[in-house]
């Protein structure tokens, strides 16, 4: 398997039968026999990457798109048209939940590649084994767990001209007797993004991470302890060509994830019971959010003439998560492999906010200032039972069936606020609210492997996303607007169908899937019209008020393919996604949902093997068709685009322990923006990296 500097190869093609994955079965199995569409970014691809963001390593996987919410340092991913809030993020199979998530954004990818062994991406809502949020899919970051000698490691440094930024990382791992370990750390400092129109302000960011793994093996027993931390500082890019704002800033000076996890596995090797797995973790996500908006608008009144409105908000929130999972693996008669388990998870969120709003007229007739403080406490608990059975009921035939039962409970335990206006103090206290739900979701897959080098599959799966605490109970402010939670929200649901084929023969590597999904009760933000949920507020030209509600239905049709031919000196490859998506509300039905109908990558690779060096080169085009969106009442259009790129990796040394990676991106200096990124893409840029394996 050959990887390239921009994460082309191993994640966009079928790996061989030796590639093991764990996400689809909660136990190690080869990728070839996976019951779902899954693709893997291996460690070599991660080492060869010169991307500044780990999200960019996923962008060429069919069905995956990048979104940024105007935050250059917090890129997220969408899968099969579903927003990042509907993509489940796992680290070693443990959820990274985010109760502050809205309808179009999630927690992000708060991990650094220095800790990673590989990344597994499952397309579709196969959440039976892992839980809610996976209508779009699952991204499981698998960390390194040790080595086969006393000490080995990787040192990596990358310079990127697009941001004039550096990234450095180191990871050391090894084993001593029955113990194994891994220590890793990274630091990244990226400047403002360089585009064909110059560098963009407010697109710089920094992040750093540290991690430790300690393991102990004794006979059939394996114990593990993981500690990791990731910290990010970034801010929002905005365009104001008309000078509408006197001041505008949205900053996240701190977004930090800290986690402690414990793991235990044992091989029972009984008549039926074969393995037992236990894991538990505590995770904290802290965020600081600062927002300032100042505008002046003319008013046709001689007593006012012009009105200046100035808003400032500072929010600190902290989410504390505790979770535990117990799982058993049985080998039953008649070729049945059964996984059963139970899971408990609790998220607790504390949020405190301070704000200032002032209104001043040019004449001085209006001069009003209001200061506010608020404090919220809320929590969500989930209990679930799950089971999945693989039954090989005939030669070449395997039937996988899974089920998961949820019991969820959310409640607002405290909601206090105080405001000061012209010496008058007003106190508010929200009533304690609660919401609960119980749901059973299922999945099934039928696989046939009776043809040489060919695996066929048909699958059905249900998706389920329960509203976050922010969507249910909290009042949030950003960009001069206020959004109210709604305790009457229902969970989002989806039914999904898929036909797929994998082929590995005659120098061809092909993975393809046709998929269809129907989703309902999508949660979206609506304009306030004076209703109770909005505290009687109404949206206007001077004040923006929104609230969450279930309004949308969606249908999605798609075709994914990744193919590579290795029978020539130059290996052609292609990966892409064809998608059509339809939204439907009580007042609207449209297929213009902002999705490019076609996007993907096509290229040629070449490997030159010499005495003391291997040179792997890759020239490719990355492209997407135009995208139109009129689902929000206003029409937006994103033109289609295509970029020409070149990457080369050079391995040298007695054991190929040194590696130089060079990527020349956007060679024609194309001016463009992707469909789901609000920040314009970088122009022509070069990135160079050095890797030392020891």
Region spans (language model):
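C-terminal beta-signal and adjacent terminal beta-strands/loops
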Residues: 464, 515-521, 525, 622-630, ...
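Signature of Gram-negative outer-membrane beta-barrel scaffolds
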Residues: 338-452, 575
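Gram-negative outer-membrane beta-barrel transporters
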Residues: 392-399, 407-408, 507-511, 515-519, ...
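Transmembrane beta-barrel wall of Gram-negative outer-membrane proteins
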Residues: 159-189, 199-237, 252-269, 332-333, ...
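Acidic, small-polar-rich N-terminal luminal/periplasmic segments of exported/outer-membrane proteins
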Residues: 4-149, 164, 464, 499, ...
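Outer-membrane beta-barrel signature, preferentially recognizing the C-terminal barrel domain
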Residues: 242, 246-269, 374, 378-380, ...
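Transmembrane beta-strands of outer-membrane beta-barrel pores
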Residues: 157-163, 176-178, 187-191, 218-220, ...
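Flexible loop and strand-edge segments within Gram-negative outer membrane beta-barrel domains
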Residues: 190, 196-197, 203-205, 222-275, ...
């Amino acid at each position: 398997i050959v990887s390239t500097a921009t994460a082309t190869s191993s994640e966009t093609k079928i790996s061989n039968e030796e590639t093991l994955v764990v996400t689809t079965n909660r136990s190690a199995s080869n990728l070839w026999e996976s019951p779902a569409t899954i693709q893997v970014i291996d460690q070599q691809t991660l080492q060869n990457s010169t991307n500044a963001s780990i999200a960019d390593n996923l962008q060429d996987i069919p069905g995956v798109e990048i979104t940024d919410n105007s935050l250059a340092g917090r890129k997220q991913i969408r899968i099969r048209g579903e927003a990042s809030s509907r993509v489940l993020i796992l680290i070693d199979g443990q959820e990274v939940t985010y109760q502050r998530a809205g309808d179009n954004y999630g927690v992000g990818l708060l991990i650094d590649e220095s800790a990673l062994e590989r990344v597994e991406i499952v397309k579709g809502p196969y959440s039976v084994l892992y839980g809610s949020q996976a209508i779009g899919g699952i991204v499981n970051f698998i960390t390194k767990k040790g080595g086969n000698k006393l000490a080995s490691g990787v040192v990596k440094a990358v310079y990127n001209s697009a941001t004039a930024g550096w990234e450095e990382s180191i990871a050391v791992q090894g084993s001593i007797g029955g113990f194994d370990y891994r220590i890793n750390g990274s630091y990244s400092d990226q400047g403002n993004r360089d585009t064909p129109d110059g560098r963009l302000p407010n697109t710089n960011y920094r992040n750093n991470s540290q991690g430790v793994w300690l393991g102990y093996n004794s006979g059939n027993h394996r114990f593990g302890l993981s500690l990791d931390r990731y910290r990010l500082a970034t801010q929002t890019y905005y365009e104001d060509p008309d000078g509408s704002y006197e001041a505008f800033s949205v900053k996240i000076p701190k977004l930090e994830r800290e986690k402690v996890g414990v793991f235990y596995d044992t091989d029972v090797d009984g008549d039926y019971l074969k393995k037992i797995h236990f894991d538990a973790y505590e995770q904290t996500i802290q965020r600081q959010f600062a927002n300032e908006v100042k505008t002046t608008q003319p008013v046709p009144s001689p007593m006012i003439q012009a009105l200046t409105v100035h808003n400032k908000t500072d929010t600190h929130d902290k989410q504390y998560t505790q979770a535990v999972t117990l799982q058993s693996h049985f080998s039953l008669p008649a070729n049945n492999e059964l996984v059963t388990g139970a899971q408990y998870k609790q998220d607790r969120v504390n949020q405190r906010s301070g704000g200032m709003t002032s209104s001043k007229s040019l004449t001085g007739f209006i001069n009003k200032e209001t200061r506010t403080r608020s404090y919220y406490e809320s929590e969500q608990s989930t209990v679930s039972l799950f089971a999945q059975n693989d039954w090989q009921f005939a030669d070449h035939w395997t039937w996988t069936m899974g089920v998961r039962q949820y019991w969820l409970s959310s409640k607002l335990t405290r909601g206090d606020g105080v405001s000061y206006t012209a010496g008058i103090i007003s106190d508010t206290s929200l009533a304690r609210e609660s919401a609960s739900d119980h749901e059973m979701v299922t999945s099934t897959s039928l696989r046939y492997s009776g043809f040489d080098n060919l695996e066929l599959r048909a699958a059905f799966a249900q998706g389920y996303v329960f509203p976050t605490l922010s969507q249910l109970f909290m009042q949030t402010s950003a960009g001069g607007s206020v959004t109210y939670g709604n305790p009457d929200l229902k969970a989002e649901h989806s039914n999904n169908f898929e036909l797929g084929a994998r082929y590995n023969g005659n120098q061809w590597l092909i993975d393809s899937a046709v998929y269809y999904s129907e989703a309902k009760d999508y949660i979206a933000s609506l304009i306030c019209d004076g209703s109770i949920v909005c505290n009687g507020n109404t949206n206007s030209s001077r004040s923006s008020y929104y609230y969450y509600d279930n309004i949308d239905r969606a249908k999605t049709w798609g075709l994914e393919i990744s193919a590579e031919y290795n029978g020539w000196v130059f290996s052609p490859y292609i990966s892409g996604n064809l998608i059509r998506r339809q939204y439907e509300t009580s007042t609207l039905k449209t297929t213009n949902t902002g999705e490019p109908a076609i996007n993907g990558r096509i290229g040629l690779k070449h490997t030159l093997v010499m005495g003391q060096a291997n040179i792997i080169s890759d020239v490719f085009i990355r492209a997407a068709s135009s995208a139109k969106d009129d689902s929000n009442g206003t029409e937006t259009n994103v033109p289609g685009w295509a970029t020409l790129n070149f990457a080369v990796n050079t391995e040298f040394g007695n054991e190929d322990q040194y590696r130089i990676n060079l990527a020349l991106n956007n060679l024609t200096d194309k001016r463009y923006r992707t469909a789901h990124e609000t920040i314009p893409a970088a122009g022509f840029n070069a990135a160079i990296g050095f890797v030392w394996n020891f």
